[in-house]
Every structure is written in C-alpha cells, then in structure tokens.
Amino acid sequence: MSKSLTQPWYMKKGYSDSTLGKQLYPLNGSLKIDPLNYTNFYASDGQIQSMFLFAVAVAGKPSRITAEKINGLLDDIEVDQQDDYAPDEIRRMGPLEYLMYLEHEPFIEMIKERKLGKYNTWLKLWRWFNDLVTPTIPNFLNTATIELLEQIPGVKYKTSRFFVLHSRSNAECVPLDTHILRFLRDRGVPCVPNVTPGSRQMYLGLEKIAVEALKSLGYSTLAKADLETWKSYSNGFRQFFREGDSTPEIV
C-alpha cells in the first residue's frame, strides 16, 4: 500500500464514524473517465470524486491524454484499496477521499507516478481538503457553490464551471474554453478574446451570452450542448451557427 494504515483524515477532523462512500468500488471501470461522455447527473459518491479529479487535472491539458492518466491513478488507488491488509474503511473510500487520507508524501508520489503535473497545486489542494470541515467530501462536491469551489487551489473560472455543468442538471454556467470562445465568434459576438478572460466581470458577461447561445441549439441539456460543441470543434470542423438555428451547420 502507499502508506501505513494510520488515522484517516475524517478521524483527524473529529468524526468517529465513516460515512465515506456507501459501497465498495470493485475493479470494474465504473469510476473511469470518458471525456466524450463526461456528464453524469446521477454520479455515485465515487464517481463524483473521479469527475472532480479529472476537472482539476484537465485544465490546460489535452482531454484524452489526461483521462488516461486519471484512469491510471484510479487503478492505482483501487489496487491499494484491494490490499489484503486494507480495512473496510479504506475499501469504502472514493478516490479523492483516499488521496486525502494519505500523508502528503505518498499523495504527491501517486500524482507524480501518473505525470499529472502542477505538483505544487496538487499539494495545495491536498492541504485545502485536509483543512476542510465537512461531513463528507461527496456531500461537499455535490453542494458547494461555484464561488466556494473556486477557493480550492487549482480550481478557477473554467474548472469550477466545467465540473458543476457536467455534474448538476440544474447548472446555469459554462466554462469559457477555446471551443466556446470560437463558437461565440462564429455567431458574430463582438470582442470575444482568443483565450479565457482573466477579468471576472468580462468572464461573467461572456458566460451569460454563451449560456443563452448554447440553449438555442436545442439540445436536451446545457451540458449536452457544451459537450457536442466541444466535439465538433475538437474534430476539426469549423461551425457557423445562424441566429435562430436549432442545430449547427457543418461546412
């Protein structure tokens, strides 16, 4: 195992009983990330954690390669949890819970083993969650506001919205990634930058326009509209959306 089985993080916070993860997570790929099918409004405790790990890791990185790395990390965690000496409380943890249970050295070793980069940020994230006072990490991930999520090291405008958009059916937000900025320019929206705006005021203004534009495409959810738009642009097609059209025209 990656560390000796000492007191887990929730015990350090004063919780005497673990409600972490309501089921064992077998080696069946159920927690694995598929970047083309990332949306999950009914995620289990374990799945919401793997979705969050991917959201943090993929910022500024290729999605397919990052998904492979995160899935490798999930495999490493599951192997540790299946160790003959692992107690049930370890086996029941979701992936983020397990990583937060580790001390900082074995934690960062697991991150480095999968070459996820941003190691200082990951370590700050580990410290942030270990200082967090909440009954469970899944509860936090399912209920935290965008503003609260943005307090986590490594989670800014795009990451917070990417995670919320694809994990909550009632989300009214969108990450202003490259594909969305191109999408807005192709719709004739003026003054759209080539990169995600650093100004919060500019971000919120463009986000409001993007939300309405994505809704006009006629997909069942905002997350679906975002994902399909990303697929179109990442496949190398240039899209031209005429005002009022319910579906994109590929030219």
Show which residues each predicted segment covers:
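C-terminal accessory module of base-excision DNA glycosylases/AP lyases that mediates lesion recognition
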Residues: 1-45, 118-128, 134, 138-251
